[in-house]
Amino acid sequence: MNTALAQQIANEGGVEAWMIAQQHKSLLRFLTCGSVDDGKSTLIGRLLHDTRQIYEDQLSSLHNDSKRHGTQGEKLDLALLVDGLQAEREQGITIDVAYRYFSTEKRKFIIADTPGHEQYTRNMATGASTCELAILLIDARKGVLDQTRRHSFISTLLGIKHLVVAINKMDLVGYSEETFTRIREDYLTFAGQLPGNLDIRFVPLSALEGDNVASQSESMPWYSGPTLLEVLETVEIQRVVDAQPMRFPVQYVNRPNLDFRGYAGTLASGRVEVGQRVKVLPSGVESNVARIVTFDGDREEAFAGEAITLVLTDEIDISRGDLLLAADEALPAVQSASVDVVWMAEQPLSAGQSYDIKIAGKKTRARVDGIRYQVDINNLTQREVENLPLNGIGLVDLTFDEPLVLDRYQQNPVTGGLIFIDRLSNVTVGAGMVHEPVSQATAAPSEFSAFELELNALVRRHFPHWGARDLLGDK
């Protein structure tokens, strides 16, 4: 058994008291990212090891695995704690996103270990989409690399405001303060171009040796700041969705018998209470909240992030994908939007193409009207392109087949985040963050139907020798 866990349970006075204490601890979701071989998996392994979150049988298995697959010689290869796929162990890299849970006396944590290779950027974006803080690892020998910049930009694009720059492998540069200072200045120069008001902190460490991870390093007396664990335990996270207006996307209509009809989902933002007047979009029909049903029984109110079932006083037509909000809020449905896109498919994104779109439980179709620009990761400049390649990041104009209720992603990730789905293979090919919904008054009318634009794109792609012109022209 985990001796640290057993001690915590004993200190709390039993399992039940310990579980109650866990419920009242704050939860921090964070990810580790950065370039390949910067030590992301090793850092997580070190955190788990030094906070005594590893069971004795896991530690014994780790010793055996280190002998077979380890890359650290005679030392424990802590990366094997999170690199679970056979291909990951054989190559010594991370491919998939690995999630791990651990807790200390002050906080609970969910870690997403993301891959560093460029071809797995899509996996990194997936891991970052649910996190509140990013640990960006930099190899002290290499400094700031392209993937460091790419992952920094993607993290901020996905709404992460807290960045911890962990300058790793300090043991390989003799724990040099000069190296730490140089990399710190290089990153700050780059970070000045990142969007948003960011909280950036720097920690010099060695994940392999444990310096400044969970305990202060004796090898770096020149550093008097907090350890990485202290930063994670004390950082204050301001959840944007708590202060935003109520948004409740309906995920499921619960009708177990003739006497009950409820609308299940997760409250995306704000709060809702019994008796509140709500409006259903896109229909615009209004009703009152009669009950708030949860697994633990009825509640008088609920808050952002809670899974609930709402029962209304009136039997009205509500289906999956509809949105409930406060009745006094005017939120118009839109049919166009500018969207920040992280493209994840080998086939590039081009104007004129159509995709299935899924957003907040609703599935519809969207046409790409044009690509405004692609972001150059090296210097964050914008350049005009005809298509968006694999791992490309850019701003795209979309037109939807039906009116949708959208928020800007930075205000509400649930009603502002979407995925692109290939209509033939049903594969997710891109992730989108609503930059700005376009009202009907400002949307430019199209003289061509969606079918005509899609057929035109198909002909130009597969029969270029026909010389068909682009119906979208310079868009």
Swiss-Prot record:
PROSITE patterns, sorted: G_TR_1 (PS00301), G_TR_2 (PS51722)
Gene Ontology molecular function, alphabetical: ATP binding; GTP binding; GTPase activity; sulfate adenylyltransferase (ATP) activity
Annotated segments matching region G2: 92-96
Catalytic activity: sulfate + ATP + H(+) = adenosine 5'-phosphosulfate + diphosphate
Enzyme's top EC category: transferase
EC number assigned by the record: 2.7.7.4
Region (G4): 168-171
Pathway given in the UniProt record: Sulfur metabolism; hydrogen sulfide biosynthesis; sulfite from sulfate: step 1/3
Domain tr-type G: 25-239
Record: residues binding GTP: 34-41, 113-117, 168-171
Database matches in Pfam families: GTP-eEF1A_C, GTP_EFTU
InterPro entries: CysN_GTP-bd, CysN_II, CysN_NoDQ_III, G_TR_CS, GTP-eEF1A_C, P-loop_NTPase, Small_GTP-bd, SO4_adenylTrfase_lsu
Region (G5): 206-208
Annotated segments matching region G1: 34-41
Keywords: ATP-binding, GTP-binding, Nucleotide-binding, Nucleotidyltransferase, Transferase
G3, as annotated region: 113-116
Highest taxon of the lineage: Bacteria
UniProt GO BP: hydrogen sulfide biosynthetic process; sulfate assimilation
HAMAP family: Sulf_adenylyltr_sub1 (MF_00062)
Physiological role: With CysD forms the ATP sulfurylase (ATPS) that catalyzes the adenylation of sulfate producing adenosine 5'-phosphosulfate (APS) and diphosphate, the first enzymatic step in sulfur assimilation pathway. APS synthesis involves the formation of a high-energy phosphoric-sulfuric acid anhydride bond driven by GTP hydrolysis by CysN coupled to ATP hydrolysis by CysD.
Subunit structure: Heterodimer composed of CysD, the smaller subunit, and CysN.
Family as reported in the entry's similarity comment: Belongs to the TRAFAC class translation factor GTPase superfamily. Classic translation factor GTPase family. CysN/NodQ subfamily.
Protein name listed in UniProt: Sulfate adenylyltransferase subunit 1
Gene name of this polypeptide: cysN
